[in-house]
Amino acid sequence: MDNCLAAAALNGVDRRSLQRSARLALEVLERAKRRAVDWHALERPKGCMGVLAREAPHLEKQPAAGPQRVLPGEREERPPTLSASFRTMAEFMDYTSSQCGKYYSSVPEEGGATHVYRYHRGESKLHMCLDIGNGQRKDRKKTSLGPGGSYQISEHAPEASQPAENISKDLYIEVYPGTYSVTVGSNDLTKKTHVVAVDSGQSVDLVFPV
């Protein structure tokens, strides 16, 4: 008998909890309807891949239950389906991730390569900053390069009007951990190659007498 009373009391608590949860859910739903945002009117971010179109009309049609009264501030159009909402959210997250990867890949800085390697492996980039002579000119170049890849740097002969003894080229390359083959030279006779294994956080200095 005591067991039956305990079970009944437990069922009563569960029933009241469910009723309270249902009432709170309806209140949240009403507040969400009043604060509805028309996402289709917002501008689609550039570079975002995917389809933001709503589901086909014939998939959203439901049997009409009779004339419905539209409250002020509400729209007559049907809300997007759950799958369309998640697809839109995934597209915005992909766009945000791509912008984050571009930021950390554009400027060589401490921790930037580690961030890109950890969170944006599919967007591998090699960034090169080139300083020529004593001037302030910098050329930045991007090219795809994964661990174990090979990158060749060709150095062309300087112009005759510029003194040869004043020319120096310092090349800074920020890469992901891996093994790389670096070749420098203006032709097949003067090309020099070094194979370097780079670990995470390691800095390697290479000198090529050209």
UniProtKB/Swiss-Prot annotation:
<keyword id="KW-0539">Nucleus</keyword>
<comment type="subunit">
    <text>Interacts with PRKACA and RELA.</text>
</comment>
<protein>
    <recommendedName>
        <fullName>A-kinase-interacting protein 1</fullName>
    </recommendedName>
</protein>
<dbReference type="GO" id="GO:0034446">
    <property type="term" value="P:substrate adhesion-dependent cell spreading"/>
</dbReference>
<feature type="region of interest" description="Disordered">
    <location>
        <begin position="58"/>
        <end position="80"/>
    </location>
</feature>
<dbReference type="InterPro" id="IPR033214">
    <property type="entry name" value="AKIP1"/>
</dbReference>
<dbReference type="GO" id="GO:0005654">
    <property type="term" value="C:nucleoplasm"/>
</dbReference>
<keyword id="KW-0656">Proto-oncogene</keyword>
<comment type="function">
    <text>Enhances NF-kappa-B transcriptional activity by regulating the nuclear localization of the NF-kappa-B subunit RELA and promoting the phosphorylation of RELA by PRKACA. Regulates the effect of the cAMP-dependent protein kinase signaling pathway on the NF-kappa-B activation cascade.</text>
</comment>
<feature type="region of interest" description="Disordered">
    <location>
        <begin position="136"/>
        <end position="162"/>
    </location>
</feature>
<dbReference type="GO" id="GO:1901222">
    <property type="term" value="P:regulation of non-canonical NF-kappaB signal transduction"/>
</dbReference>
